[in-house]
Design a protein with these regions (language model features):
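Flexible metal-binding regulatory segments at protein termini and peripheral loops
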Residues: 1-132, 144, 230, 255-256, ...
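Conserved cytosolic catalytic loops of P-type ATPases
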Residues: 27-46, 53, 206-209, 238-332, ...
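Actuator/coupling domain of P-type ATPases
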Residues: 61-69, 74-76, 80-81, 135-137, ...
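Soluble-to-membrane junctions at the N-terminal ends of transmembrane alpha-helices
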Residues: 81-103, 154-177, 339-371, 388, ...
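P-type ATPase nucleotide-binding
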Residues: 456, 460-588, 600, 612-628
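Membrane-embedded alpha-helical bundles of multi-pass transporters
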Residues: 116-131, 160, 179, 418, ...
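Conserved ATP-binding TGD loop and adjacent catalytic N/P-domain core of P-type ATPases
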Residues: 17, 348, 438, 518-520, ...
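Conserved catalytic phosphorylation-site environment of P-type ATPases
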Residues: 296, 355, 390, 403-477, ...
Length: 846
């Protein structure tokens, strides 16, 4: 069972490490992850072996508070509540800080002003007023200590529980300075009572009230700055929450009624007008709209929607009017799921953080030990007690476990948030880290490299067979199949007006094709392997099939009663950005491998068109996982990119599984990274983002370790004998505050992350990239065509364009366009002439 808890009282990584350690000791707990940034904890435990009450008890015994987070609370509401709590805490801290600074300014003026020649009231000057001078500092320090008493409460409480943290260091440092100063007050009183002015003067010069106050104030300043910076790390989640419309227009009792969006019920009819945000997920019942989905997918071009199309909550209807049926509300909406994914990813730990976690767990006890040793060594070496104490206090307050603890989670939080803004959902910190290790990317062809919407490109009949007969039998058989190629054949036949009947005894042979009975005839539709197995003679058609395969078509032979009737060639257009994405991957040093069930010749045609380094053809759906495993056994770190149900095992097997956004729920569930758009360039972005985040984490960890490695010896006075350097407690506390702020600010640089290809094109991608492979220049173009009315029209245009040397074309009736790949010798005029000669009008070539 997996349960999320809110945890209170944590102030640094030592706290989170102790909470994690305490809960992991509870019998039945399998895994614990504590998030210092979100003050939350996720626990996986065996139901029956333990329960939430035992876990909360363990946290309380460790000196902190915990409560179960409501699993049914919508992510948007939870995030809003977190924002309110954070804002309230920031307001209190700001109030506390303001008064602390006010008292500190007066204290510093009095304690240091006489050294700088600044004017002081007469009652604070002279030997006879030394006690007044000291007591004034005491009374100015006490309010600062009271305002910041939280450090003492948390610090000493943690110390007594055997889990000292950063608050413990601050509390011990400021208390030591305060107690020593109070002891100097007694010495002053004793000396003045005996008339020993020099002794009293020496005691007055060794007061550290301003150090005690300065430590508390500077640490609070640092905490305030750190808090504000940390809040910015979750800006992406805040933006997502703000996307959701607050109200919805629904039809109740036949009337339009405006209600809060969270009160919409499943099955209700929701009205969406131009310019309005869509409040929930659902399906359009009537009307049309132009929907801006950029907030969810990152795609800037609005999408036309009509009856039957799905729409997503938090997207915006830019134009049009429609009514929709709500089918996903509250925590089930796409937006809520995205928020939950981003939160969970930000709260997860990357393996690179393990060293920092180990160090954080023992850091504070080690620092306290070093501080005690520092005082003892200086006293034994003959230094004054005030010098030794100042060095010990400096060690306590300069040490910063927070920098270590924040190094990884801040970078992961900002990185996953930045990914979400670009339509890339990263499920965990481990996935984010692992992606930077990838050296091989395996791409499923259909729906990943290609559009996933095949269309019939050519029909060839055997002698004595009509096209209508061939299409009728093929479509009747394929209608029982759910394969994309089958859908293309059925659609083509229906558009041609061919009668489609019902097939019986339907059977599918994996990797070969399908068979069944149509109008009393045994019909086969499949590849050459199926024809050979069924002993169907190809009558020389295999030569033409080979030519079509070399052009990137997938060829299906159609036979009836063991006699070949003809063949149908189907083409799946390559996505416009696939070539550029593959080129970018290769430039990043990644090996690109394409998996496809197509014939070898078809696969080689796609390989040549896109410049893919390696192709594995005729792969059965169940064998994709085996191919990924084989690559891993060769020593490769493999990322698998796919969108189908049969991709799920391969996605799970890969080091990183990437589900492309148009894919199935099963594929998305199996993946580590989900791309909301069906764009391969987002794979490039995901890998580059991973590399940027890991680089940022390494910078943070390097800073945190180096800061403590240099700062602690400096504070202890190691360099004093040689260079006469001694760090005062005030500078130590300032340095500690700066250290945490530096780490958070460095992580915030990731908010400006842009993938390399966007930088090249000024923040935009090239929609139709040109490519140069092995000295041969090829270009991909889109020809907009008017006048095509049916599948016969597309066939004529297809034939006209493919008759040109150096041209490979796929024609889409739905898009009223032809997608062509041409070599540099073919001009736009030649393309236009071919279409016009076929009897159609060209409205544009892109």
């Amino acid at each position: 069972m997996k349960q999320k808890f809110d945890v209170t009282g944590m102030s640094c990584s030592a706290c989170s490490a102790h909470v994690e350690k305490a809960v992991s000791r509870v019998p039945g707990v399998d895994q614990v992850q504590v998030n210092l940034l979100q003050n939350s904890m996720v626990v996986e435990y065996e139901d029956g072996a333990t329960d939430a009450a035992a876990i909360i008890h363990a946290v309380e015994d460790a000196g902190y508070g915990a409560s179960v987070k409501d699993a049914h609370e919508p992510a948007k509401k939870a995030e809003n509540d977190l924002q309110k709590r954070t804002a309230e805490e920031a307001k209190k801290m700001k109030h506390r800080l303001g008064w602390s600074i006010a008292f500190l300014i007066v204290l510093m003026y009095i304690s240091m002003g006489h050294m700088l020649g600044w004017p002081l009231p007469g009652i604070l000057l002279g030997h006879e007023n030394m006690m007044t001078f000291a007591l004034t500092q005491l009374f100015l320090t006490l309010p600062i200590m009271y305002l910041n008493r939280k450090y003492y409460e948390n610090g000493f409480k943690s110390l007594f529980h055997g889990a000292p943290n950063m608050d413990t260091l601050v509390a011990m440092g400021s208390t030591a300075a305060f107690v020593y100063s109070v002891s100097r007050l007694y010495v002053m009183g004793y000396a003045m009572g005996r008339g020993e002015t020099d002794m009293a003067h020496m005691a007055a010069m060794n007061l550290y009230f301003e150090s005690a106050a300065m430590i508390l104030t500077l640490v609070t300043i640092g905490k305030y700055m750190e808090s504000r910076s940390k809040n910015r790390t979750s800006d992406a989640i805040t933006k997502l929450v703000d996307l959701a419309p607050k109200t919805a227009l629904v039809v109740r009792n036949g009337r339009e009624t405006e209600i809060p969006a969270d009160q919409v019920q499943v099955g209700e009819t929701v009205i969406v007008k131009p310019g309005q945000g869509i409040p929930v997920d659902g399906v359009i019942l009537e009307g049309t709209g132009t929907v801006d989905e950029s907030a969810i997918t990152g795609e800037s071009i609005p999408v036309e929607k009509k009856a039957g199309d799905r729409v997503t909550g938090a997207t915006v209807n830019r134009a049009g009017y429609f009514q929709m049926k709500a089918d996903r509300i509250g925590e089930d909406t796409t937006l809520s799921q995205i928020i939950r994914l981003v939160e969970e990813a930000g709260g997860s730990k990357a393996p690179i953080a393990k060293l920092a976690d180990k160090v954080s767990g023992i850091f504070v006890p080690v620092v306290i030990t070093i501080a005690v040793i520092t005082i003892i060594v200086w006293l034994l070496s003959g230094a004054t007690f005030s010098f030794a104490l100042a060095s010990g206090i400096a060690v306590l307050v300069i040490s910063c476990p927070c920098a270590l603890g924040l190094a990884t989670p801040t970078a992961i939080m900002v990185g996953t948030g930045r990914g979400a803004e670009q339509g890339i959902l990263i499920k965990s910190g481990e996935s984010l880290e692992t992606a930077h290790l990838v050296d091989t990317v395996v791409l499923d062809k259909t729906g990943t490299i290609t559009e996933g919407h095949p269309a019939v490109a050519a029909v060839r009949t055997a002698p004595g067979v009509t096209e209508a007969e061939l299409l009728g039998l093929a479509a009747s058989l394929e209608k029982a199949s759910e394969h994309p190629l089958a859908e293309a054949i059925v659609r083509y036949a229906e558009e041609a007006g061919v009668e489609v009947s019902q097939a019986t005894e339907f059977a599918a042979e994996a990797g070969q094709g399908v068979s069944g009975m149509v109008s009393g005839r045994k019909v086969l539709a499949g590849n050459q392997k199926m024809m050979d197995a069924q002993k169907v003679t190809l009558d020389g058609m295999d030569a033409e099939a080979g030519k079509l395969s070399e052009e990137g078509r997938t060829v299906l032979y159609i036979a009836a009663d063991q006699k070949l009737l003809g063949m149908i060639a189907v083409a799946d257009p390559v996505k416009k950005t696939s070539a550029e994405a593959i080129r970018e991957m290769e430039q990043m040093g990644l090996d690109v491998v394409m998996l496809t069930g197509d014939h070898e010749k078809t696969a080689r045609a796609i390989q040549k068109q896109l410049g893919i380094s390696r192709v594995i053809a005729q792969v059965l759906p169940q064998d994709k996982e085996r191919e990924v495993r084989r690559l891993q056994e060769e020593g490769h770190k493999v990322a698998m990119v796919g969108d189908g149900i049969n991709d799920a095992p391969a996605l799970a097997r890969a080091v990183v599984g990437i589900a492309i956004g148009a894919g199935t729920d099963v594929a998305i569930e199996s993946a580590d990274i989900v791309l909301m758009k069906s764009d391969l360039l987002d794979v490039v972005t995901a890998v580059q983002l991973s590399r940027a985040v890991i680089r940022n984490i390494k910078e943070n960890l390097f800073w945190a370790f180096c800061y403590n490695a240099i700062g602690i010896p400096l504070a202890a006075g190691v360099f004093y004998p040689l260079l006469n350097w001694q760090l005062s407690p005030m500078f130590g506390s300032a340095a500690m505050s700066f250290s945490s702020v530096f780490v958070v600010c460095n992580a915030l640089r990731l908010k400006g992350f842009q993938p390399g290809f966007r930088k090249k094109h000024g923040g935009k991608t090239t929609a139709v990239p040109a490519e140069e492979k092995k000295g041969e220049l090829t270009m991909k173009k889109t020809i907009k065509i008017e006048g095509m009315m049916c599948s016969h029209c597309t066939g004529r245009v297809d034939k006209a364009l493919n008759a040109l040397d150096g041209v490979t074309a796929t024609v889409s009736l739905e898009d009223k366009a032809a997608y062509v790949t041409v070599d540099g010798a073919v001009t736009d005029e030649e393309l236009k002439k071919a279409v016009v000669d076929a009897g159609y009008e060209v409205t544009g070539i892109e």
